[in-house]
């Protein structure tokens, strides 16, 4: 099972590809960046094209996407929503299932605490994926955490079936 975690954003869209198994294995992670000087419609094309290449190359079985839970800044929320739309469109076109998680769900599944701090989360991702250093930038680390979250919730669901 291969999962692509996506932390959506207009300026930076984080991605992380994780292969299931014991242990979980990070295959790739990074960010897709869009130049701020481009108009929004061109930035969306950049996100679309780069993410399409990632989906084609890694062939994930599922995409774990951060759910837009709330935002203090309306402009930021709109930009994140537009980036999420690109992710959902591409997955829909390829019939790739999308599972959405709130930041609190990711923190609970990966960090063991729904209010874990960013550094704690990065350290847990590093440990769970046996990475030599903390994953950077933050958007890529968040995307890896989303992919790990998918596996953690899947394991919990399997355990519940046997109890």
Swiss-Prot record:
Mg(2+) 2 binds at residue 66. It is found in: Cytoplasm. Transmembrane segments: none annotated. Signal peptide: none annotated. It is an enzyme of class 3 (hydrolase). The keyword Magnesium applies. Keywords: Cytoplasm, DNA damage, DNA recombination, DNA repair, DNA-binding, Endonuclease, Hydrolase, Magnesium, Metal-binding, Nuclease. Binds 2 Mg(2+) ion per subunit. GO terms for molecular function: crossover junction DNA endonuclease activity; DNA binding; magnesium ion binding. HAMAP family: RuvC. This is Crossover junction endodeoxyribonuclease RuvC.
């Amino acid at each position: 099972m291969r999962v692509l975690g996506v932390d959506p954003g207009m300026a930076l869209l984080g991605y992380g590809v994780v292969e299931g198994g014991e242990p979980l294995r990070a295959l790739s992670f990074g960010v897709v960046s869009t130049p701020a000087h481009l108009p929004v419609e061109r930035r969306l094309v950049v996100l679309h094209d780069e993410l399409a290449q990632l989906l084609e190359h890694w062939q994930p079985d599922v995409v774990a996407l951060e759910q837009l839970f709330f935002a203090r800044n309306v402009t930021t929320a709109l930009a994140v929503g537009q980036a999420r739309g690109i992710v959902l469109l591409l997955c829909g076109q390829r019939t790739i299932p999308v599972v959405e998680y709130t930041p609190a769900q990711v923190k609970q599944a990966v960090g063991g605490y729904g209010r874990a701090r960013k550094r704690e989360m990065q350290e847990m991702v590093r440990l769970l994926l046996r990475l030599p250093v903390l994953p950077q930038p933050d958007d890529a680390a968040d995307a890896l955490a989303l992919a790990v979250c998918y596996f953690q919730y899947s394991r919990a669901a399997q355990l519940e079936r046997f109890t």
